[in-house]
Amino acid sequence: MKESLKERIKLWKNLYMNAFENAVNAIPNVEGVLLAYNTNIDVIKYLNKDDLERRINQIGKERVFEVIKAPTERISSLEHLFGGILRSIKLGKAIEWFVENEEIRRYLREWGWDELRIGGQAGIMANLIGGVYRIPTIVHVPQNPKLQADLFVDGPIYVPIFEGKELKLVHPKEAVKEENELIHYIYEFPRGFQVFDIQAPRENRFIANADDYNARVYMRKEFKESFEKIAKGVELAIISGLQVLKEYYSDGTTYRDVLDRVESHLNILNRYGVRSHFEFAYTPNRLVREELIGILSKFTSVGLNEVELASIVEIIGDETLAKEVLEGHVFPIIDAINLLMDETGIDRIHLHTYGYYLALTKYRSEEVRDALLFASLAAAAKAMKGNIEKIDHVKDALSVPTNERAIVFEEELEKEFTEFENGLIDMVDRQLAFVPTKIVTSPKSTVGIGDTISSSAFVSEFAMRKS
């Protein structure tokens, strides 16, 4: 080993400080970001053991426990709701099920919440990119009721509206309509949380999704009719929310109707030289997942975690590699992102997993690594605070310890790759960037951390390379 653990940690501390300064200085140079398609209201409740046990006993513990063993993956009864919550706690896994009836939706409202936040990947990123980084941001909102509009922070955040035949960009608070409240009920639990004899192996959340619009990737009239005009005003675009697509809908439409429109949007973005990032999320439907892989070549960049990567590799046809990726070792993950780049031709792949991030690019640049470091600080700030309100919150994350376990992976990479320096590996026709992340041991919230990571890395890398 070339350096002691202490020396390596000191090296990364310096790299983190430099990356923060470089990113913050460069971010004002970004002229505009477009975010589509999913925005909603996140209702957050921190689970209480006594309250949860009381509610489960009232409806019948045995029936609820049956759902843990045989998950319904949808909610049409209280047994389904609480069975889903307990399954999420038992596995320490983020689980999201759709709420199918109004009676359960009323129950969820009456159960109440601890916090209201803007939700959906596009909505969360808008408050970060526009509200904290102060970059002009245009965000798609399927509906814009007052409850949701008030959750957008002040800053250069805009939604397109028609005034007569003229397209205008205004803050969501200036575009309120009597529209549906699209609510995702999020039940958070910490590591070690115990209910009955079930204990959470790690912190996570269960989501009861009572949102009929984002479930279909509904697009507003303004986006359908004036997308080209909207695209002309931005340099970057981040697309998300496609993971919910189904093969068929009751009105006779299919996932293909949505993807055709998405592809037409991508063609416009590419025509105007707008760099686009696709935030991949686990997509249960295999056919939809296959189609999403098929359009990756139209994007500049994709962001995903190891579970999502494995689900893609399985579709590509290497089931053995997919299983190895899920085991979490760094070399199968590197093989998998190289395979994904071979298959799609995409320029940039950003993988975020617990403890470290990787970025595989077709270009060489120290800014790729610095962007990952900046994203790690943003993620740590989000975990600590629950919500990032100012850039100083990101700076405060410099004091969070760097993950020492990831240093072991760094040492293995050094042995495997001769061209390895300060987290950058020259792979002949590609560059691989590796960074150990900041780890917050008791996060206040886990919602939106992946979106914070990917958007911060994509936007700050572009800003620094542009500078």
Curated annotation (Swiss-Prot):
Output the Gene Ontology terms for molecular function: ADP-specific glucokinase activity; glucokinase activity; metal ion binding
Give the enzyme's main class according to its UniProt record, as a single word: transferase
- Where along this sequence does the record place binding of Mg(2+)? E279, E308, D451
Residues the entry annotates as binding ADP = N305, H352, T353, V440, G450
Give the cofactor binding note. Answer: Binds 1 Mg(2+) ion per subunit.
- Necessary cofactors: Mg(2+)
Q: Which InterPro entries match?
A: ADP_PFK/GK, GlkA, Ribokinase-like
Q: Which PROSITE patterns match?
A: ADPK
Q: Name one Pfam family in it.
A: ADP_PFK_GK
Q: What is its EC number?
A: 2.7.1.-, 2.7.1.147
The protein's superkingdom reads Archaea
Q: What is its main location?
A: cytoplasm
- Which GO biological process annotations does it have? glucose metabolic process; glycolytic process
Q: In which pathway does it act?
A: Carbohydrate degradation; glycolysis
List, alphabetically, the Gene3D superfamilies matched. Answer: 3.30.1110.20, 3.40.1190.20
| Localization per record | Cytoplasm
Kindly list the residue ranges recorded as spanning the membrane. none
Q: Where is the active site?
A: D451 (proton acceptor)
Enumerate the catalysed reactions: D-glucose + ADP = D-glucose 6-phosphate + AMP + H(+); D-glucosamine + ADP = D-glucosamine 6-phosphate + AMP + H(+)
Q: Name one GO cellular component term.
A: cytoplasm
Keywords of the record, alphabetical order, are: Carbohydrate metabolism, Cytoplasm, Glucose metabolism, Glycolysis, Kinase, Magnesium, Metal-binding, Transferase
Q: Which residues bind D-glucose?
A: D42, E96, G120, Q121, H184, D451
What does this protein's UniProt record list under function? Catalyzes the ADP-dependent phosphorylation of D-glucose to D-glucose 6-phosphate and glucosamine to glucosamine 6-phosphate.
The name this protein carries in UniProt is: ADP-dependent glucose/glucosamine kinase
Look up and give the organism this protein is from: Thermococcus sibiricus (strain DSM 12597 / MM 739)
What is the primary gene name for this protein?
glkA
